[in-house]
């Protein structure tokens, strides 16, 4: 199944953070924080203004992005956890 985001939403796959401390202690999944970085998998066409114009999303597929810990809506597609996030919830593009 494929997702096509609407309006100013993007589909993001979380990037796994390192699950070890600097001293080599492995952090179990239950104690690990959700990563706040991800890769953009799909981009919606943009937000419609009051006069009917479309403002395109300023992201592209493949961008690595930063977002808030609780941003977006989680969805499971083909066994993979993805996020549907509004463009305004994305804090920065990692370059």
Curated annotation (Swiss-Prot):
BP-aspect Gene Ontology terms: chaperone cofactor-dependent protein refolding
Main location: cytoplasm
Subcellular location: Cytoplasm
Record-linked Pfam families: Cpn10
Keywords: Chaperone, Cytoplasm
UniProt entry tagged with the keyword Cytoplasm: yes
Keyword Cytoplasm set for record: yes
InterPro entries recorded: Chaperonin_GroES, Chaperonin_GroES_sf, Chaprnonin_Cpn10_CS, GroES-like_sf
Gene Ontology CC terms, in alphabetical order: cytoplasm
Subunit: Heptamer of 7 subunits arranged in a ring. Interacts with the chaperonin GroEL.
Described purpose of this protein according to its UniProt entry: Together with the chaperonin GroEL, plays an essential role in assisting protein folding. The GroEL-GroES system forms a nano-cage that allows encapsulation of the non-native substrate proteins and provides a physical environment optimized to promote and accelerate protein folding. GroES binds to the apical surface of the GroEL ring, thereby capping the opening of the GroEL channel.
Family that this chain belongs to: Belongs to the GroES chaperonin family.
Descriptive protein name: Co-chaperonin GroES
Source organism of this protein record: Bordetella avium (strain 197N)
């Amino acid at each position: 199944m494929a997702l096509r985001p609407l309006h100013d939403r993007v589909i993001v796959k979380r990037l796994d953070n390192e699950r070890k401390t600097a001293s080599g202690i492995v952090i179990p999944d239950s104690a690990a924080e959700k990563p706040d970085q991800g890769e953009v998998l799909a981009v919606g066409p943009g937000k419609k203004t009051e006069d009917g114009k479309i403002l395109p999303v300023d992201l592209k597929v493949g961008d690595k992005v930063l977002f808030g810990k609780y941003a977006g809506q989680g969805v499971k597609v083909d066994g993979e956890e993805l996020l549907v996030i509004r463009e305004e919830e994305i804090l920065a593009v990692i370059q």
